[in-house]
Amino acid sequence: MDKLQKTLEEWKEMLDPAQYQVCRLKGTERPFSGKYNETKTEGVYHCICCNEPLFDSTTKFDSGCGWPSFYAPLEGSAVVEVRDVSHGMIRTEVVCAKCDAHLGHVFPDGPPPTGLRYCINSVCLDLVPRQ
């Protein structure tokens, strides 16, 4: 996969302020505030920055955490997991494999079959409904 690289200024011009804060500056939207937290629409969730397909709605589940949760990304290299030691915690950050947008974090407390919970900010996603 070819990497998409832009300067922070280019991203700032392209994204709205909330998208820029979360995707490029590694922010987090408030829990239960995202438009996809309770969405049941079937489709594929794409990266808001580069349109790369990331997650399928068939892997989405209600974790109760306040952010859209998935038990697996799309097959292949849709996302990359990166060690995150910010805020005095040790976590695993999830970024888009194509453009390095911060998406959220992955935790080992999800349902079968993976046991993982990809906790993703809605503002980072664009849902393309299945036809």
From Swiss-Prot:
Root EC class: oxidoreductase
Any GO MF annotation of the entry: zinc ion binding
InterPro entries associated with the record: Met_Sox_Rdtase_MsrB, Met_Sox_Rdtase_MsrB_dom, Mss4-like_sf
The keyword Phosphoprotein is annotated on this UniProt entry: no
Domain MsrB as annotated: residue spans: 8-130
Pfam families (UniProt xref): SelR (PF01641)
Keyword annotations of the record: Metal-binding, Oxidoreductase, Zinc
Recorded catalytic activity of this chain's protein: L-methionyl-[protein] + [thioredoxin]-disulfide + H2O = L-methionyl-(R)-S-oxide-[protein] + [thioredoxin]-dithiol
Superkingdom, natural source: Bacteria
Catalytic residue positions: C119
Entry EC no(s): 1.8.4.12
Residues involved in Zn(2+) binding: C47, C50, C96, C99
GO biological process annotation, one example: protein repair
Binding note for cofactor: Binds 1 zinc ion per subunit. The zinc ion is important for the structural integrity of the protein.
GO cellular component: cytoplasm
PROSITE patterns assigned to the protein according to its UniProt record, in alphabetical order: MSRB (PS51790)
Co-factor requirement: Zn(2+)
The keyword Lipoprotein belongs to this UniProt entry's keyword annotation: no
Similarity field: Belongs to the MsrB Met sulfoxide reductase family.
PANTHER family in the record: METHIONINE SULFOXIDE REDUCTASE, METHIONINE-R-SULFOXIDE REDUCTASE B1
Protein name (Swiss-Prot/TrEMBL): Peptide methionine sulfoxide reductase MsrB
Organism: Pseudomonas savastanoi pv. phaseolicola (strain 1448A / Race 6) (Pseudomonas syringae pv. phaseolicola (strain 1448A / Race 6))
